[in-house]
Amino acid sequence: MGLLLLVLILTPSLAAYRHPDFPLLEKAQQLLQSTGSPYSTNCWLCTSSSTETPGTAYPASPREWTSIEAELHISYRWDPNLKGLMRPANSLLSTVKQDFPDIRQKPPIFGPIFTNINLMGIAPICVMAKRKNGTNVGTLPSTVCNVTFTVDSNQQTYQTYTHNQFRHQPRFPKPPNITFPQGTLLDKSSRFCQGRPSSCSTRNFWFRPADYNQCLQISNLSSTAEWVLLDQTRNSLFWENKTKGANQSQTPCVQVLAGMTIATSYLGISAVSEFFGTSLTPLFHFHISTCLKTQGAFYICGQSIHQCLPSNWTGTCTIGYVTPDIFIAPGNLSLPIPIYGNSPLPRVRRAIHFIPLLAGLGILAGTGTGIAGITKASLTYSQLSKEIANNIDTMAKALTTMQEQIDSLAAVVLQNRRGLDMLTAAQGGICLALDEKCCFWVNQSGKVQDNIRQLLNQASSLRERATQGWLNWEGTWKWFSWVLPLTGPLVSLLLLLLFGPCLLNLITQFVSSRLQAIKLQTNLSAGRHPRNIQESPF
């Protein structure tokens, strides 16, 4: 069960305080206040971080498909038929890698972040990849997709090198092919998507300039003033406002559609030279995976969301934003907050689902590396306990600061009281001058300090439990590492002490019987037979 986060939205004056640890608090209150919600102050905001808790996904708009940036990760494997040519092949590989300055050469960690997502609305664009032996990441139904691009990912593309072409840029001899439903592309071209992004290297194989009449309008996603264009050469999308100039926005280095299509195929490198012989020799294959670089955006594939798509992926995916299961409740309700343990937080009966929380929250922006099932449960719980202990420390420090401010205010009030008594000394003091009862404020800071001390002790206890819970196992394994080899001799010695006397008696009896048999056999062989005495008839 995931940990439930509960945040109390306080009064507007306190909630306006910007705290780096609570961006959700600030964003949620801004959204509630802008919509005129009665729950903009004094309420509970609850969310679940469990990967199995239903969440809500919102598809990205067509314009966001042109602005969300992706990145590529490259890995390679040697051809199994390559023998005795590793040295020149390594030289060629280092040359080819120099042509990929904008590609990360360390593969990411793959896997779904959430597995129970409900898509709200219709996705304007979906990408379908079909491959016989690919990695299935999930499939969206066709009813939730406005336009579906189908990628022909069963092709195997090769780049051939000769000796004098070792330093030429690698590129797909045939780019991944995309098919569309009939009537999707209109015969309306534009020069808006000409050129290349200035922030990217021009040596990458997919950054070839678009030819004329190859940047076509997508009918289902365009209007009279706003066009969504497809560059079929680079498999990139562009958004153009016909009422404005050409230089409207900077195109991302790697677009989402380009990354998704490139990740469905791999580039094979072959060579012909005096090193490899006159025939075509396959050397290695590049496997390219893609990830979303824009913070807060995810691939939505079926009911799963992913931060990265592996090479040779299959399924039907779109991009969008995700929020976990969120609900709000009035602040006068009593919500139990577990300090330590794995008991789930019960859902409040009067809770209201907080659906309008959109992409600006960025709740899941930091979960791209995270991935379920990588760490051990015991380590996770110990880290969780440490985090809770740290939160208690932070809360104790906040209470200490508030108490210091109250003490300072009380000192100022008492000082003013003494000053007024001095000014009204002739009338007997301020109380007699006002003809009112004289009241004094009893400072409760001692009780507050005791409570803070208890919180700090509880945090220390939690931290020790978390540390000992993990380190005890680690220490036990250290003892096992040298005690375990002594277990065999100790067990053997114990068995010998238990059954040794019995075995010794059995061996003694066996030896004695054998000696008696040998002695009898010796007597018989020496002719010492007993005489047969016949009885006399008389």
Swiss-Prot record:
| Glycosylation sites (chain numbering) | N133, N146, N177, N220, N241, N247, N312, N332, N443
List where the motif CXXC lies.
43-46
Annotated motif CX6CC, positions: 431-439
Chain positions of site Cleavage: R350, A351
Position of sequence motif CKS-17? 414-430
Instruction: Report what the Swiss-Prot or TrEMBL entry states about this protein's PTMs.
Output: Specific enzymatic cleavages in vivo yield the mature SU and TM proteins.
Q: Would you indicate the residue range of the signal peptide?
A: 1-15
Role played: This endogenous retroviral envelope protein has retained its original fusogenic properties and participates in trophoblast fusion and the formation of a syncytium during placenta morphogenesis. The interaction with MFSD2A is apparently important for this process. Endogenous envelope proteins may have kept, lost or modified their original function during evolution but this one can still make pseudotypes with MLV, HIV-1 or SIV-1 virions and confer infectivity. Retroviral envelope proteins mediate receptor recognition and membrane fusion during early infection. The surface protein mediates receptor recognition, while the transmembrane protein anchors the envelope heterodimer to the viral membrane through one transmembrane domain. The other hydrophobic domain, called fusion peptide, mediates fusion of the viral membrane with the target cell membrane.
Q: Which protein family is it in?
A: Belongs to the gamma type-C retroviral envelope protein family. HERV class-I FRD env subfamily.
Assembly with partners or alone:
The surface and transmembrane proteins form a heterodimer. They are attached by non-covalent interactions or by a labile interchain disulfide bond. Interacts with MFSD2A.
Q: What is this protein called?
A: Syncytin-2
**To which species is this protein native?**
Homo sapiens (Human)
